[in-house]
Amino acid sequence: MKDLSKEIEQVIKGVQARKVILQTLLEGVPKKGSDLRRALADAFDRRINGVSDALIYFNLQALENAGYIHSYREWKDKYAKLNPEWIQPLRNYFRVIAPITCVGFIGDDPRVHLQLRMKFKLNRQFRPEKFLFFTSSRMRGRIAGFFDNVKVEFIQDNYLFDYKTVLKIIDEHIRKILPTHEVIIEVGHGTRFCSMALHKISLQYGLKSFYLTDDDQIIWIDE
């Protein structure tokens, strides 16, 4: 996993307001200008009206130009949110700890979800709160033993050999999870295209990825 600390520092440029804005957006929900004004007032120990529009929007524009955030308008309110590609790198930079979701694929061996769950139950460093697995629609009814924190998404069998479709399906789910959870990805199971898609997503979003061996050992992939 690539260290983007230097790149982040070049964008922040030591400007405290940018740090505050990014940390506030890491809370996982889009923020209105009034939310950011309040966060900046708290950080600088000022009154709300002591935070100027220029301070907020100049720094928002700098972060948006750098590709870290994007803003949009809903009715009369303008919102800002982090771009998904920067959520985990910014968590790493600010040392923000988020609950973990482990994502993987269930191939011909339907026990993978049980193996991973038991493996991480004994892991001191990573304790996933949730598990999300993708699998073929033909596995419906063949997988059992689910716990409440395990979710399975079924993909039509004919899509599993279409790389772009698999990538799109998985990507849509990852984007929904990222604002609130750190995602770690097991890339060793499923079709070739599924493994490729999971690996690409781990690189795109700066996520930790690993391989579960046949003897249930976890090998972390260091990019």
Kindly give the residue locations of the regions a language model identified.
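Conformationally flexible catalytic loops at phosphate/diphosphate-handling active centers
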Residues: 185
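Long, low-complexity, Lys/Arg-enriched
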Residues: 1-182, 193-223
